């Protein structure tokens, strides 16, 4: 018997109206859960059910090719519980029917979380599997307040307090609930002594209940650079198309740091935020037979996006091979250090730069170490950066002159 998936989506949220359908990263929030269920590969589409009281929700959710069940009016009130809804929904199924409840308010849960949790449930003798996350703030630091406003339960709480000595505590994060009809209806709960806690990391466990929660999730998705790169594929493709110059014989391949760079006789294909990986995907589309030289300064966005150092090595090799096959001479710069940036560290940049130095030496590729001009004590100079990653105008002017000297010197060799 195949498992079924149930996604509750009542329309009457008062704290955050229509929270289940609010647009999040380009699609209704409920679609993040529907898509995760589909992509898990654990259900037939017809066995993924949205339970709702809204005809509008129904109409939109059907666009995903799944099933929608309209709730009875008495199951659509604030007083109706999840148990009430599930008891009614499961009434026509066999007692051994396995089901998965996915709450819309956990939009960061991934398809592989669902798959892993279901595989554990199927292969172990447990009553239920429920997703849990570690508590960030330990309850030993929680307190009630007296009528006068005193923290009466906290007396001496900081004496010898060491977070690392406290036993980790976990809470159900609301993302995944797995059981079967007989067990759940008998216990009227997903929590028994035989409920297995499927652990999920904090970054996947955000729960949307209030507007602040929703803004938090928006911020999380905005700063998920891997998702951003995927979503921006078309944007970058169109950008290269707009920049296309069939007559260009010398080109600049870079990111936001070289957008303003102007080298004599060079056409600039730089785009802000682009990775070496994305640039490589698009390069054949604008690499004409006229191109003879390429000035390349790129790579830090690959680290920010989450590419490994080894993947970046490989992509630089692919770039060199592609240019060499087309008899295009390559001029390269190192990657500039950063300063106090959470998304990238200079140890990785140094590894890549050391590799580039050796690679360029072996293949006789001219290499300009821009950190000679920009760094201080192994970091990007504070006075030459606007945000720890990008350059000030002073730094751009300095690099402009150094880049021109570099290509001019190479020209005379």
UniProtKB/Swiss-Prot annotation:
Q: Which cell locations does it reside in?
A: Cytoplasm
What cofactor(s) does the depicted protein rely on?
Answer: Mg(2+); Mn(2+)
Show the SUPFAM superfamilies listed in the entry.
Answer: Nucleotide-diphospho-sugar transferases (SSF53448), SGNH hydrolase (SSF52266)
> Which superkingdom heads the taxonomic lineage of this protein's source?
Bacteria
GO MF term list: N-acylneuraminate cytidylyltransferase activity
Entries under Pfam families matching the protein: CTP_transf_3, Lipase_GDSL_2
Catalytic activity annotated for this protein? an N-acylneuraminate + CTP = a CMP-N-acyl-beta-neuraminate + diphosphate
According to the UniProt record, what class of enzyme is this? transferase
Q: Name one GO cellular component term.
A: cytoplasm
What are the BP-aspect GO terms?
Answer: polysaccharide biosynthetic process
What keywords are assigned to this protein?
Capsule biogenesis/degradation, Cytoplasm, Exopolysaccharide synthesis, Magnesium, Manganese, Nucleotidyltransferase, Transferase
The EC code for this enzyme is: 2.7.7.43
Its function, per the record, reads: Catalyzes the formation of CMP-N-acetylneuraminic acid (CMP-NeuNAc), which is essential for the formation of the capsule.
The family annotation for this protein states: Belongs to the CMP-NeuNAc synthase family.
Concerning PANTHER family, the annotation shows: HAD SUPERFAMILY MEMBERS CMAS AND KDSC, N-ACYLNEURAMINATE CYTIDYLYLTRANSFERASE-RELATED
What name has this protein been given in UniProt? N-acylneuraminate cytidylyltransferase
């Amino acid at each position: 018997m195949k498992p079924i998936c149930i996604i509750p989506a009542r329309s009457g949220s008062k704290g955050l109206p229509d929270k289940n359908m609010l647009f999040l990263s380009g699609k209704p929030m409920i679609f993040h859960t529907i898509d995760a269920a589909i992509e898990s590969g654990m259900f037939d589409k017809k066995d993924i059910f949205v339970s709702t009281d809204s005809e509008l929700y129904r109409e939109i959710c059907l666009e995903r090719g799944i099933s929608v069940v309209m709730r009875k009016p008495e199951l659509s009130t604030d007083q109706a519980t999840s148990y009430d809804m599930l008891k009614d929904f499961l009434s026509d199924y066999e007692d051994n029917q396995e089901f998965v409840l996915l709450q819309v308010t956990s939009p960061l849960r991934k398809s592989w979380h669902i798959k892993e949790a279901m595989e554990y449930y199927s292969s172990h003798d447990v009553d239920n599997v429920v997703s849990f996350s570690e508590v960030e703030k330990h309850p030993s630091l929680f307190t009630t307040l007296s009528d006068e406003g005193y923290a009466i339960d906290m007396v001496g709480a900081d004496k010898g307090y060491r977070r690392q000595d406290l036993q980790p505590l976990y809470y159900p994060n609301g993302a995944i609930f797995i059981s079967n009809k007989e067990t759940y209806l008998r216990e009227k709960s997903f929590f028994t002594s035989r409920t297995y806690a499927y652990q999920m990391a904090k970054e996947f466990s955000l729960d949307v209940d209030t507007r602040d929660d929703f803004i938090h999730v928006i911020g999380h998705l905005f700063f998920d650079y891997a998702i951003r790169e995927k979503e921006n594929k078309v944007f970058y493709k169109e950008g290269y198309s707009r920049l296309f110059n069939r007559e260009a014989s010398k080109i600049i391949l870079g990111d936001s740091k070289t957008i303003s760079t102007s080298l004599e006789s060079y056409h600039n294909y730089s785009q802000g935020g682009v990775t070496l990986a994305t640039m490589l995907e698009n390069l054949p589309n604008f690499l004409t037979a006229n191109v003879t030289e390429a000035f390349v300064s790129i790579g830090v966005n690959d680290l920010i996006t989450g590419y490994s150092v080894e993947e970046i090595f490989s992509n630089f090799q692919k770039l060199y091979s592609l240019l060499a096959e087309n008899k295009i001479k390559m001029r390269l710069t190192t990657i500039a250090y950063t300063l106090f940036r959470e998304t990238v560290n200079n140890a990785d940049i140094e590894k890549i730069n050391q590799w580039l130095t050796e690679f360029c030496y072996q293949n006789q590729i001219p290499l300009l170490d821009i950190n000679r001009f920009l760094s201080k004590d192994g970091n990007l100079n504070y006075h030459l950066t606007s945000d720890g990653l990008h350059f000030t105008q002073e730094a751009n002017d300095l690099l402009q002159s150094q880049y021109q000297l570099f290509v001019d010197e190479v020209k005379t060799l």
